A protein has these predicted regions:
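Conserved "repeat-terminator" motif of extracellular CCP/Sushi domains
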Residues: 1-16, 125-128
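Short, aromatic- and glycine-rich surface loops/edge beta-strands on solvent-exposed regions
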Residues: 73-81
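Compositionally biased low-complexity segments at domain edges in trafficked proteins
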Residues: 14, 107-128
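Aromatic-rich carbohydrate-binding modules that target alpha-glucans
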Residues: 28-69, 81-94
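Boundary/junction segments of secreted and surface-exposed precursor proteins
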Residues: 17-26
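Extracellular Ig-like/FN3 beta-sandwich strand-entry sites
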Residues: 4-6, 70-74
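Short, surface-exposed beta-strand/turn "edge" patches of beta-sheet domains
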Residues: 1-7, 94-117
């Protein structure tokens, strides 16, 4: 590009809308230095991705944030080995749903926190 060029270039920055979800594991899932991750899936175009969850001190639960335009609409919550830190199925100790053949649908009713049942085999969405 020449300094004397009559062509002008502009950049437009668009802020992506995000949504934060929360996860409340039971006491059993918190043992042995486990960490938590979520496997997110877009059922419309069959894309998926791993997200690590971080602990939210103020709410006493774990969280992850998705970009709304990515269209992820279902998840698998995973209890991961403390080490290695890589999110992949080989490092997943337990998951919900436990059937290995399904997902938990992300809520569309304003609820934003998945609370794991005491037996670790399911849970329900609540508002945090």
């Amino acid at each position: 590009m020449s300094v004397n060029s009559s062509v002008h270039y502009y950049a437009k920055f668009v802020k992506s809308e995000t949504k934060t979800y929360y996860f409340m594991p039971n006491d059993t899932w918190k043992k042995d230095g486990a960490r938590f991750a979520v496997y997110v899936h877009n059922s419309s175009n069959d894309t998926s991705e791993w997200y690590s969850m971080t602990y939210d001190e103020a709410l006493s639960c774990y969280s992850f944030t998705l970009t709304v335009s990515d269209g992820y609409n279902e998840v698998i919550f995973c209890r991961m080995k403390g080490s290695p830190k890589e999110n992949k199925w080989e490092n997943c100790l337990q998951q919900v749903p436990a059937s290995y053949s399904g997902y938990v649908s992300l809520p569309t009713d304003g609820k934003n926190c998945y609370e794991l049942n005491s037996d670790g085999n399911g849970g329900s969405w609540i508002t945090k």
